[in-house]
Each structure stands twice: as structure tokens, then as C-alpha cells.
């Protein structure tokens, strides 16, 4: 009516932000043997022990879809099986919820879980995730890369 142009609001799109974060993290851990499966980065060590990094977004229905957590897990097949005679062949990959040992970024180093606000600068989030992965998660994954090491550390 008056010729004023209405500025279009920039919509926040959490999946696109998580895609960017996940791509950067994957580029850093791919040389270490991780493969991408949806929102999960997975690798096998010692043949069949899974090590998992998973990106979890909040739920829109709860109003926290702008938040993200990084889940960390290790799956030891013998601890996941429900019978003494395993019949299922090894899967191509496992998810964080399949893991025997589970935690979140932040808790790995004995602090509170790290929650990321996806409305903040993406490059800052990526730097923090990579920093925590390199300083705390990957060293733990290196230590807990065999059944013997997992049992030894669990006894401590």
C-alpha cells in the first residue's frame, strides 16, 4: 500500500547447521577410520568393537530444536548380546544407543554435558567440538580400543 518493502525474516534451520558441523567433524575423523551413517560417525577397532560419535538435536515439540549434544559411545558385542549363542552377523555400523559405554561431550572430561546452541556462530561450535574430541574423546577411544583395555580401565 505505501510501497514499503517488508524484510523477509531469516529462518533458523537446525538440520542445515548440524550438517555443516557434522561435515567438519567428519573431515577431521575420517582419516582415523570413521564412516558416516546418518547423524552417526562410526568405526570398528579390534575387529568388532564400535566407537561412535553421534549428533543429537533437540525436539521442536519441546521447544529445544535449537540445541545440540554430541553423544559418545563404545559398543562391546559380548555386553550387548542377549543370548549366549550370538546368531546375528556383525552389522555395518552401530548407533550410540547400541553402545555399552555411553556419555556426552563434556561429561567425558568430568564436567557437565556440553550443550550447543545452534543459533550461535557455527565455526565456534565446530572449533569447540573438535577441540574436545581431540583432547578428551579420541585419547579415550585410543585407550579403550580392546576388550582387555576396557576391562582393565573399568576395574580402576
Q: Where is each model-derived feature located?
A:
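Pyridoxal 5′-phosphate
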Residues: 29
